[in-house]
Amino acid sequence: MADADARAPPKSDPGATPIGSISPSSAAPAAGEDEVEVEVEVEEQLAGLAIADQGEELLLPKPTGWEDGPVVVAGDEVSGGEKLPGEVAAAVGVEGAAADSRPRFPRRPGEPDCTYYVKFGSCRFGMKCKFNHPARKKKSRVKGSNGGSGSGGSNSSSNKASSPDDEQQAPKEEYGSYVPDISPEVDSLGFADKGSASNLENFKKYSYEIIDVKKGRVEPKELKVAKEKRKEFISEGSSQEECKYYSTPGGCKFGKACKYLHRDGKEGKTDAEKVDLNFLGLPLRPGEKECPYYMRTGSCKYATNCKFHHPDPSNVASKDPQLEHENGDAPQQDVQGSSSQPNASIWPDQRTVNEHHVPFIAPSPSYSAGMLPPQGMYPPPEWNGYHQVPLNPYYPPGVPFQHFPAAPINHPMYKAPEIPGHQQVPSEEYPERPGQPECQHFVKSGFCKFRMKCKYHHPRSPVPPAGALSPLGLPIKPDQPVCTYYGRYGVCKFGPACAYNHPFNFSPVPAAGPPLLPAQYPTPGNYTL
């Protein structure tokens, strides 16, 4: 046994079996030799074979997962049973060691595919990566006569499966630097055929579409479908996209000029349907706070975009039941329909305000026909109270212009104290504070919504005395500048409560004569005092 241990164990063929490695002499011993020596020799050969197998197992590289790659065997033997010289075997060993030094990537069929490896053909984690690295399908390339692999310069069926080294070089050779393969022979992500054993469910549940071939950009089709659905929703629901600022507390600053759609709540009402407009074209919002600027000045720079309430003058009438009209009837109810008709006459509402809140206001007759009513006759209840003078004559400018007939200043219709129901505003309703500034809203409109709570002064006579009104019912104040609105349009929205001058031409009334033509009506620009 000591001699057997001293001898070097012979190398065994990897494809040979232990029975095949026994020499014929030991398998068929001579009849004259001792049987004990034969058994000892057989045991020595079997023991040497086991030691050789253990040594080869230590020298062989660990499996890398590439089943289709060649296995390099260290030693003087190669698969096939042929023996090579020591120099050739050493060269094969060096070549195998160089192949082992290149990065390898594991195959893990039960794990998801490595995203980075699928896109770029490389993975920085190498063998430590816990994901699957499937085989990449290469482009079919026709090799020339001098570029053939193997003996005879042709590709044999045994070399159909490429080595891992060639597959690692494939991304650089075929797809460029870090650009996914978009050739027609592979799918959009560079996967192999759909029948491969790798687990592709996690990366193929979304379908992709190539949107830029040069840059290698891909986009999920789900995003494209979502964009198309959004366009269809916009086209089906309305002809324009919905404004995103309209539903915010600040609203849309463009108002009706906005090119997007303004929807109100789930019902989808547009802004043209949601509010009514008063006679000035301002929105009526009964449930909202009254616009402070509108209540002070009678106008609002925000127009229809204002979020506050702009009540009509008829809606702010006094609640005192003792106030009556000049004919002794009960006060008329406020006309609500006038708010939605901007072209309707605005002075019935203003007349109601003046009758209830402004003292010393007498109704003036209508001069549409150019004649005065008989003395003592009052106009009917449906009288407008204020007639707008036409600005443009119906006849050419060559027609001689006559002055409008004026009523005597002492006409009984202009004597407000004689009209019942028009008494002076009681001091209990509006406080008088001589040391404080005058309430501008009370001076202009004759009404103050704060009443006794107002901290400003409310003079007892906010309008001019009797006899200072023109036939149009507007105050004549020579010491004040001409009302800009009256001089421009011929009307004044404040009526008798206006603090500016509203001049008018007066001349003696002719004894008898035909009615005046429409072209003979005076204009606000043609007046002299």
Curated annotation (Swiss-Prot):
UniProt zinc finger (C3H1-type) residues: 108-136, 237-265, 285-313, 433-461, 477-505
Keyword DNA-binding tagged: yes
An example molecular function term from Gene Ontology annotations: DNA binding
Biased composition (Polar residues): 333-344
Alphabetized UniProt keyword annotations: DNA-binding, Metal-binding, Repeat, Zinc, Zinc-finger
Stored InterPro entries: Plant_ZF_CCCH, Znf_CCCH, Znf_CCCH_sf
Domain of life: Eukaryota
Positions of the UniProt region annotated as Disordered: 1-36, 134-179, 313-347
Biased composition (Basic and acidic residues): 1-10
Entries under Gene3D superfamilies matching the protein: Zinc finger, CCCH-type
Biased composition, class Low complexity, residue ranges: 14-31
Protein name, as recorded: Zinc finger CCCH domain-containing protein 65
Organism: Oryza sativa subsp. japonica
